Swiss-Prot record:
Organism of provenance: Thermoproteus tenax (strain ATCC 35583 / DSM 2078 / JCM 9277 / NBRC 100435 / Kra 1)
Gene Ontology biological process terms, A to Z: non-phosphorylated glucose catabolic process
Protein name: Glucose 1-dehydrogenase
Record bears the keyword NADP: yes
Record bears the keyword Metal-binding: yes
GO molecular function: D-glucose binding; glucose 1-dehydrogenase (NAD+) activity; glucose 1-dehydrogenase (NADP+) activity; glucose 1-dehydrogenase [NAD(P)+] activity; NAD+ binding; NADP+ binding; protein homodimerization activity; xylose binding
Residues binding NADP(+), per UniProt: 178-181, 260-262, 289-291
Amino acid sequence: MRAVTVTPGVPESLRLREVPEPKPGPGQVLLKPLLVGVCGTDKEIIEGRYGKAPEGSDYLILGHEALAEVAALGKGVDNVSEGDLVVPTVRRPLDCQLPVDYCPPGKYLEHGIWGLHGHAAELSITDAAYLVKVPKELRDIAVLTEPLSVVEKGVELGVESYKARLGSPPKTALVLGAGPVGLLASMVLRLMGVSITAVATRPHDSLKARLVEELGGRYIDAVHERLEGEFDLVIEATGAPSLAVQGLERLAPGGVEVLLGVYPPTGELKGLGSLLTDAVLKNKLVVGSVNAGLRHFERALAHLKEANDSLNGFPKRLITKVVPLERYQEAYVWTHDDIKVVLQVQT
């Protein structure tokens, strides 16, 4: 079968190759991947900066954001049936008793990222216990479930932390970034009735800006406009340290900033002491969030349906490019105006 692979640690080793077909063991399912989303983590792996092949393999099959059809069942599987549409979660625990999304580094494997093959292949396998069923009517947008699950966990942490301390949900939110995660965060917050301001570097006539405004949010062009005001909740979805700091500065007293990005190492920031003192005196909270649990995937599917029905098909407009498997290389190169690029493995 064909699969999109890399040699972890070797830059620009991306290729489409023939690999052996996997066979499901007890408790596993054989999947027929249909659509696979591409994200910044894939780019890091392709550049040789991250990723680990499964034990005994010299290559890693990419693809951790997937919509698939169940092709065959391993022994003992009874929670799904052949032909079901499903989304597999990403992470699998290794000797970790915590919820899988809270397992520390070294205590988990991740499909298409770390120690487990992904789903950018004509067939893949995963554990049946980590599958979420997808309604047929969400087939065209369910590939957004995994990135949205990350948002769901982050928003849950932010909103529940705010409510636990101040007794009511946040009314205003600042979303830093208008890529897939930023726009999905804006979508979820809009569905929750929170007033949104989103900041990114694209101009006001860009698709990203128009999508924020379509949600009823205010868009700030960070290149030409100054961000002002205070916000109850900040969702940082860029991975830029300077914006994470700006988010902390813009928190209202008692506010919560949720960090969803992965940041490059930097030196000490100017004015850091004053910023931290302000955080103490105003009871500000900063929380990091990574990965997601099954309930976040389930909530993501519910929000995709709600947004599709009530926001005039908004989720579909986040998918800006669909690339067939034969032209796989095009899926891993995107422009500033692309939002979610998807690899169509098969129809």
